[in-house]
Amino acid sequence: LECAQIGEVTDTGRLEYFRHGQKVADIPAFSLVLGGGAPVYDREYTRPAYMDEIKPYDPPAPADTELVSIAHRIMNSPNIASKRWVYEQYDHTVRTGNTNTNDPSDATIVRLKDTDKSLAVTVDCNSAYVHADPYIGAMIAVSEAARNIRCSGGIPLGVTNCLNFGNPYNPEVYYQFVHAIKGMGEACRKYGTPVTGGNVSFYNQSVLKDRTEPVFPTPTIGMVGLVEK
């Protein structure tokens, strides 16, 4: 990958900035780290009531005579049916770096020209899992991404994220956010995949009749891995 060296790591615990050889800034790194010296919001949050309501859910097993019709309904649902008709319209040969074909693949493989290495890239999240349990659901999202990388022959290297939630001033929504972050962090530590960046999108909600409904919590995980020849 093309890159430019912009500095070096030291053991001073400080960030020093230089311009034309002259030091122009000297800042304690601790003061810039969330959870360290940087300000952190400490909002009120409460466990959503629906989590206790859905926990004991145990749907009855369908009768044998209903299995075929149930399978048809499931496979016809836009949430379940294949999305190939959408993503296969993209020209995957752009810039001649993508080694994938239209065959099923757990991750996209992008070759690094002039090397014997490639990158495996995947994006994953099942918001229904996160809605049911934000902590475990976020761990599942990271785990799915790691599996996709490994099943494509790669070694997981790092993570970025796109965190989509409702109104953070809603204590139940903020609970989802807090516990999804904790679950994501726990899984990333397990896989040794640092979170190099990401973004947070709040206030994703819709007004339905007389109530405001937030979207399902969706901490989308983007993971990259290294595939060696």
Identify the residue ranges that each predicted region occupies:
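Glycine/proline-enriched, intrinsically flexible loops and inter-domain linkers
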Residues: 1-229
